[in-house]
A protein has these predicted regions:
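Short glycine-enriched, charge-decorated loop/helix-capping segments at active-site entrances
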Residues: 20-26, 136, 170-176, 232-234
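Extended active-site neighborhood of metal-dependent phosphoesterases/phosphodiesterases
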Residues: 59-150, 180-194, 209, 220, ...
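His/acidic metal-ligating clusters that form di-metal
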Residues: 34-47, 133-215, 247, 276, ...
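Active-site-proximal beta-strand elements of phosphoester/diester hydrolases
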Residues: 3-16, 117-127, 157-159, 214-221, ...
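N-terminal active-site segment of His-dependent metallophosphoesterases
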Residues: 1-65, 108, 150
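A short C-terminal boundary segment appended to hydrolase-like catalytic domains
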Residues: 2, 243-283
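Active-site glycine-centered loops adjacent to acidic/histidine catalytic or metal-binding residues
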Residues: 11, 52-53, 82-83, 161, ...
């Protein structure tokens, strides 16, 4: 089996204009900078995977900016639906590489694709707005997962926006997980011998969890971070966190995840308020 390499990025949070800012940073310049860095890498990845929150508010203007920025990539890009996205909008506005949809309706974004014999599955855990920011896998999505997560088959990698298992951070565990994440984890167990990893975003923090032989791996946001400490009852904007993406190698005998943090962009810093604070977590 030949190696496969990909870029994992997440939580770009495009706004309606390039001037849009969140947590004290303008997201558009960072996304553009990430694309430039990916195109300059000394190793050409096979694809880019964006695990959701392409936008902050799913407007045509925000998706148009995202489409324009990511069209400059030299390799195909794929998307998962974040809690700030809608699956229908991603279908409508964003171009992806070759894939096979797992469900025919445009209200769900779930699909598979294959690269050099490696199997990739994207799950849609975007639930109803009433449970936001938590996720939920529908019965249909659990059926898709169980059909893919069998003991035998090619190397398998899973992508979704939300974490499925506990992060040992009180607020995150109460508010950010997939409601039926334990059911998802149990569904994955038959495939753990060929499962290369479950990659997600949502938490704006580089985090790895290893449970029952399964690697769960989150990537930092491309522009703004959250704290996830085990003694926090409420998360905060992490102004010490660096923006980043991950360079992932799927080798015959191992999975390598290399975090690629990069320096803050002076031109992307948003003005602070008179009291010295930056925008809140949802601005």
């Amino acid at each position: 089996m030949l190696p496969v390499t990909f870029i994992h990025l997440s939580d770009t949070h495009f706004g309606p204009t390039p001037e849009y800012a969140r947590q004290g940073h303008r997201s558009h310049p960072y996304a553009r900078h990430v694309v430039e860095m990916i195109n300059r890498l000394p190793v050409r990845p096979d694809f880019v995977m964006h695990t959701g929150d392409v936008t902050t508010h799913p407007t045509p203007a925000a998706y148009a900016l995202a489409a324009e920025v990511f069209a400059a990539l030299d390799v195909p890009i794929y998307y998962a639906t974040g809690n700030h996205d809608t699956s229908a909008d991603i279908h409508r506005y964003l171009t992806m590489g070759p894939k096979e949809d797992c469900q025919p309706d445009k209200g769900t974004l779930s699909y598979t694709f294959t690269v050099r014999g490696h199997r990739f599955l994207v799950l849609d855990a975007r639930g109803p707005d009433a449970i936001d920011p938590r996720g939920l896998l529908s019965p249909q999505q659990l059926d898709v997962l169980r059909a893919e997560a069998t003991p035998d088959g090619p190397p398998l990698t899973i992508f979704t926006h939300y974490p499925a298992v506990r992060l040992n951070s009180p607020w995150m565990d109460a508010n950010m997980l997939i409601y039926n994440g334990e059911e998802m984890h149990q569904a994955l167990l038959p495939a753990r011998g060929r499962l290369r990893g479950v990659f997600f975003g949502h938490i704006h923090n580089s985090t790895q969890i290893f449970r029952d032989g399964i690697l769960y791996c989150a990537v930092a946001s491309t522009f703004a971070g959250f704290t996830t400490w085990p003694n926090e009852e409420m998360i905060k904007a992490d102004h010490d966190a660096m923006p980043a993406f991950n360079f992932v190698q799927l080798l015959p005998e191992q999975t390598i995840v290399q975090q690629r943090p990069f320096a803050r962009l002076a031109e992307a810093t948003a003005p602070r308020r008179a009291d010295g604070s930056s925008r809140n977590l949802e601005d």
